[in-house]
Regions:
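Short, well-formed alpha-helical segments that are part of the catalytic scaffolds
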Residues: 15-29
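A conserved acidic beta->alpha catalytic loop
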Residues: 25, 42-51
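Glycine-rich, basic loop-to-helix element that forms the pyrophosphate-binding segment
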Residues: 68-84
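Short aromatic/hydrophobic "clamp" motif used to bind/position activated sugar donors
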Residues: 89
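Conserved donor NDP-sugar-binding/catalytic core segment of glycosyltransferases
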Residues: 101-136
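Short, flexible, basic/aromatic active-site loop/helix in glycosyltransferases
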Residues: 134-157
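Nucleotide-sugar-dependent glycosyltransferase catalytic core
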Residues: 182-183, 203-235, 250
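Acidic donor-binding loop at a coil-to-helix junction in glycosyltransferase catalytic cores
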Residues: 184-190
Length: 260
């Protein structure tokens, strides 16, 4: 059914200064290159990003290049999902990198726990230059490799809101897609939509997603709290509205995480 073991979706937009580091980290992955495809999806870049993608694709068979009109990261990821041919799907932003054994470790873990979970996560390590920043508080809960019950009071505050994840490829027309109507929290909603059936999450302690925290990111701009309210209240109403009576503790913890 699947041509590859792992599909990596890389949305690309005006990232020529960082893109080579991202792609080189994928070339260093220890997973067999016959089991790997990387979808480089250019979202209407105005710089030399598309040219870099094409150069790598000419040299290395794992890379596949697509060029779209600018539609935003959610639409770009959805295009990637719909064109993925791997059993598992993971995501990497074009200015970020993965440690060398990430994809193989995550795929092996998923193989062992396939029926228990729909999503595997691993550490996201924010950095800029030589400086590494504090890890998210969820890693005080996620200490060991394993499967965690998100309805357990001890683990409901794990709050997976970022794209250091791997999910199953359910096949054409069956995969969860990103909500293109959201200006914020599209990652958070996507993760919850994938997790909501089993409410369990897999965690691999050794792989790392190295997140480049560049100056001027969206989350650092003034007025962010205002835009969260204006752009995401409908999202919360829809998500809470799925349940009559008991709302999963994990969903409640996501909301608390936002308002804090």
């Amino acid at each position: 059914m699947f041509k590859y073991r792992m599909s990596v979706i890389v949305p690309v937009y005006n990232c020529e200064d960082y893109l080579a580091s991202c792609l080189d980290s994928l070339l260093r992955q220890t997973i067999s290159k016959d089991e790997l495809e990387v979808l480089l999806i250019d979202d209407g870049s105005k710089d030399g990003s598309l040219g870099i993608c094409k150069e790598y694709a000419e040299k290395y068979d794992i890379f596949k290049v697509f060029s779209l009109e600018n539609g935003g990261v959610s639409a770009t990821r959805n295009f990637g999902i719909e064109h993925s041919q791997g059993q598992y799907i993971t995501y990497l932003d074009s200015d970020d990198t993965l440690t060398d054994n990430t994809l193989k470790t995550v795929a092996d873990f998923f193989d062992r726990h396939f029926d228990e979970i729909d999503l595997v996560t691993y550490k996201i390590v924010p950095y800029y230059g030589e400086q590494k920043f504090a890890l998210h508080y969820r890693y005080k809960l996620l200490k060991k490799t394993g499967v965690y019950d998100l309805e357990d009071p001890e683990y409901c505050y794990i709050t997976q809101t970022t794209m250091n994840i791997c999910v199953k490829n359910l096949g054409e027309g069956k995969n969860v897609l990103f909500d293109t109507s959201l200006a914020f929290h599209e990652d958070q909603k996507y993760c919850f939509d994938v997790l909501s059936d089993k409410l369990k999450i897999g965690f691999c302690s050794r792989p790392e997603y190295l997140y480049l925290r560049r100056p001027g990111s969206t989350t650092g701009k003034k007025g962010y709290a205002y835009y969260i309210f204006e752009n995401t209240m409908a999202m919360w109403e829809e998500m809470f509205g799925r349940y009559e009576g008991h709302v999963p503790s994990y969903l409640q913890s996501l909301y608390i995480n936002d308002i804090n």
